[in-house]
UniProtKB/Swiss-Prot annotation:
EC nos: 2.3.2.26
Listed SUPFAM superfamilies: Hect, E3 ligase catalytic domain
Descriptive protein name: Probable E3 ubiquitin-protein ligase HUL4
Organism lineage: Eukaryota, Fungi, Dikarya, Ascomycota, Saccharomycotina
Family: Belongs to the HUL4 family.
InterPro entries xrefs: E3A/B/C-like, HECT_dom, Hect_E3_ubiquitin_ligase
Gene: HUL4
Length: 839
């Protein structure tokens, strides 16, 4: 067998070993080279054109370019009944042995089961065709797969299970099949059907134990070594699917059981966490060049990667790092016992640490498939995708590099639209490319970082213009309004300051002496949004069946009214600007929109579930119609492609609209009922509100222009705008972060009474207190602990009401004589407080 090696880049280890075609007697060098990507790590490699396979020098997997055709014998498949029969025979023999013989001969007794596995693991096809589900929407019968692993795990000997893992590793290392260009193997699964065997391997139950270094029966050094090898290759293969196969994978993931789906998300996230911990332990080492991959030998002989080898040491690789990082504080630590490299307290992962780390990149790509599936069919909260280790990434540099890579990619595509050659960059991967890994708090930090830069830039430009023109130019966006005309005054002020919307916002209420340090701004947002949702404006409608708000349907004659001062178009534009300013100025709004509203802002595709959330009764009736398949369908429903809706100002007036050309004369039949439902949803979620939503969108993105907004999904945007959706206030957590001034402390009687009263309040009353103190009745998306809550002492006036400084989230309490007096004064203050003035 002949080999060929070639350096692609002299700076690193971009060399590949080309394995000659086994059918060729000799290897003829060819000067014509082509590029192919590794089907495991995704590295782009250059190789001679006339070879059938080569070995990747990064992950050491053999990439097959021209696979061998195999025929599948059904008798070679894994069959649980056959395995149980073999197991029963082995158990009978095992039970007849005495205690000493059981210990000495257990491997021999269960050798039949080991042989059964070995004969079916020569190629990928027996495993690939096993455990089929009767459900056409599922790729695997997960109950059968679970039973298969249970049989192997519960054997008196671990050897059959270990042999299975070794065989899996060999198949992953040398699949003998061209996985880069898969061909359909089953009409049911199409292209993705060739990867079923990898999905079965990913169900191995000890993977999480390996990553977390948990105590378990199969958590010996050899098991950890082989299971890690299997896992990293399996993750790599599933992350490097071609576009068509990836779409098919996402389709099947949408129908996966929720508990299995959540388990996969957890596994891949643990895999990413493991490799960040590994990077931490290799900082400052020559092997940490971004492409080093620990092999079997590393696990078997390294105390660092395999801590159990040093039984006297209390340091466990992953366990230790989880304690360090997940505790929220990075403590100084050394990467090994004899290392002189000590990490700083404020250590952050640099993009150079992980930017070319293929394990993290492939893990993130696989998690992306799961995330996309979750966006279409909600399986788990988006917070399940957050990786806490990512909180210790240098997010500012990652964000800047992400923007640079995006510009470089766009420039490359524009200049080399006809070129298919690979593009090289010092850092090929940033966390911002997979923003679902960032926690919401980190995304808000990135948004605030970019917002602060834009605001400072706008203020700087205003100052420079003032110097050039010798004029006074305000560095703030100042809006001066009257309470009774808050919408009109705000619209006029915004129209006159279109170029200043990215400046820091300052609000002034006419005839009120308050100085805006944050509180007036919150009050303005609250009053303005409340006025915009007034039914008299006709901008939004209340949907009784869901108790949510939605854009009013614009009648055709009103398109003429979409122009001019105070028109619907201008008010929608104003609402968009207000929403953008609220995000820019970190202010929470009380909005009652469905998830579809935030999906449309983020450009996400709407689904049937979005329609059901907004119109649950209508949607349920539609689904019942779709289920009915009787011959008398048209007689029972008697529908046409037409809909009707009330006028937004006069509900007694009804408007009719056709869902398609000549819809009023086209009957809904069994054949076209699905198209009818699709057009119905499209009308109410898109077409009917298009003019108003487009005006809103223009206003919103006139303010929100930065790239950081692209990091947020619809669920996160809703939390960013409206705060946490929790239906209770965690009083103990709020108390733990509260600061005291003026002589109060946590043990002061008045303070203790205050917390007792707050705990006894119902949630609506608690929200009123939050609004009284902070200017908003919603808890921030990042939790109640991020509210800088303060309680101050006022020594005189024990018969007066409590005061608040919403600018500073501060409540001022007098020295009340008892708890009931404080309770009564608080209730009066909460019910009757509005406006700003001297007290």
């Amino acid at each position: 067998m002949s080999f060929f090696s070639r350096n692609i880049n002299s700076k690193d280890r971009h060399k590949i070993q080309i394995i000659s075609n086994s059918t060729a007697p000799s290897f003829e060098p060819n000067n014509e080279f082509v590029t192919s990507s590794c089907c495991c790590c995704g590295t782009i490699l250059q190789h001679p054109k006339n070879i059938s396979k080569f070995r990747c020098s990064v992950c050491y997997v053999t990439v097959v370019l021209q696979g061998t055709a195999f025929t599948q014998d059904k008798t070679e498949l894994f069959d649980l009944d056959d395995m149980r029969e073999l197991l029963s025979s082995c158990n009978n023999t095992y039970r007849e042995l005495d205690k000493d013989e059981k210990r000495l001969r257990k491997h021999e007794v269960f050798h039949l089961l080991e042989d059964y596995i070995a004969t079916r693991m020569v190629t990928i096809f027996p495993l690939n065709a096993s455990f089929e589900s009767s459900n056409p929407r599922e790729m695997l019968d997960y109950d059968q797969v679970k039973e298969f692993y249970r049989i192997l795990m519960e054997l008196p000997t671990k050897k059959p299970f270990y042999s299975f893992l070794v065989a899996c590793n060999e198949l992953l290392k040398r699949p003998h099949v061209a996985l880069n260009t898969p061909t359909p193997t089953n009409p049911k699964y199409k292209r993705i059907g060739l990867f079923r065997w990898i999905l079965i391997i990913l169900e191995v139950p000890i993977f999480k134990q390996t990553l977390a270094n948990a105590e378990a029966r199969c958590n010996t050094p050899h098991f950890r070594a082989i299971s890690y090898e299997v896992l990293k290759k399996a993750v790599g293969y599933m992350s490097c699917l071609d576009e068509a196969s990836a779409k098919e994978l996402v389709h099947f993931l949408k129908y996966m059981q929720k508990d299995i789906f959540a388990s996969k998300v957890e596994l891949v996230n643990m895999y990413i966490t493991f490799h960040f911990a590994r990077i931490l332990h290799t900082i400052g080492k020559e092997t940490n060049n971004g492409k080093y991959s620990p092999q079997l030998e590393d696990f078997e002989h390294s105390e660092k990667l395999n801590p159990s080898l040093n039984q006297g040491s209390a340091k466990k690789l992953v366990h230790t790092n989880m304690n360090i990082f997940f505790g929220g504080i990075v403590r100084p630590m050394t990467s090994s016992a004899n290392s002189k490299d000590i990490l700083a307290l404020n250590y952050r992962f640099s993009p150079e640490d992980y930017g070319n780390e293929w394990h993290i990149k492939t893990g993130a790509r696989l998690l992306l498939c799961l995330y996309v599936a979750n966006q279409s069919a909600y399986k788990c909260p988006v917070s399940n995708f957050y990786n806490t280790m990512i909180d210790f990434v240098d997010y500012k540099r990652d964000f800047e590099l992400w923007q640079d890579l995006s510009k470089l990619s766009a420039s490359h595509e524009k200049e080399n639209s006809g070129s298919s050659g690979p593009r090289y960059s010092p850092v090929q991967f940033t966390i911002c490319q997979c923003p679902f890994l960032f926690s919401l708090g980190m995304k808000i930090s990135i948004l605030e970082y970019e917002t602060r830069r834009l605001m400072e830039y706008s203020a700087e430009q205003a100052f420079l213009k003032a110097l050039d023109r010798k004029q006074v130019v305000d560095v703030y966006l100042k809006i001066r309004v009257r309470r009774e005309f808050v919408t009109t005054d705000s619209l006029r002020s915004i129209q006159n300051q279109q170029k200043d919307l990215k400046k820091s916002l300052r609000i002034e209420f006419v005839n009120e002496p308050g100085i805006d340090a944050g509180g007036l701004r919150k009050e303005w947002f609250l009053l303005l949004t409340r006025d915009l949702f007034n039914p008299n404006n006709g901008l939004f409608v209340y949907v009784p069946e869901s108790r949510l708000c939605w854009f009013s349907i614009m009648e055709s004659i009103e398109h003429e009214l979409l122009q001019g001062e105070g028109s619907s178009s201008e008010l929608y534009y104003l609402f968009g600007v207000v929403l953008g300013l609220a995000i820019y100025n970190s202010t929470i709004l009380d909005l009652k929109f469905p998830r579809a509203f935030y999906k449309k802002i983020c450009g996400e595709v709407l689904s049937v579930n979005d329609f059901l959330e907004l119109y649950p009764e209508t949607g349920t009736n539609m689904l019942k119609m779709l289920e009915y398949d009787g011959e008398d369908f048209e007689d029972i429903f008697a529908l046409t492609f037409e809909t009707c809706f009330p006028d937004r100002f006069d509900e007694s007036k009804i408007h009719y609209r056709q869902l398609c050309p000549d819809g009023s004369t086209q009957a809904v039949t069994r054949e076209n009922k699905h198209e009818y439902f699709r057009l119905w949803m499209d009308f109410y979620l898109n077409r009917s509100i298009a003019p108003g939503f487009e005006s809103f969108r223009n206003g919103f993105f006139h303010v929100i222009e930065g790239n950081s907004f692209r990091l947020f999904g619809s669920e996160e945007l809703e939390q960013l705008v409206c705060g946490s959706n929790e239906q209770s206030l965690d009083v103990s957590m709020l108390r733990s972060v509260t600061r005291y001034q003026g002589g109060f402390d946590d043990n002061s009687p008045v303070v203790q009474w205050f917390w007792e009263i707050l705990s006894e309040m119902e949630y609506p009353q608690q929200r009123k207190l939050l609004h009284f103190v902070t200017g908003s009745d919603r808890v921030p998306a990042t939790g109640v602990t991020t509210i800088p809550f303060r309680i101050s002492r006022i020594r005189s006036g024990a018969d007066r009401l409590p005061l608040s400084h919403t600018c500073f989230n501060e409540i001022c309490l007098h020295e009340y004589k008892d708890k009931e007096t404080l309770r009564n004064k608080l209730i009066i203050a909460l019910e009757e407080s509005q406006g700003y003035g001297f007290r």
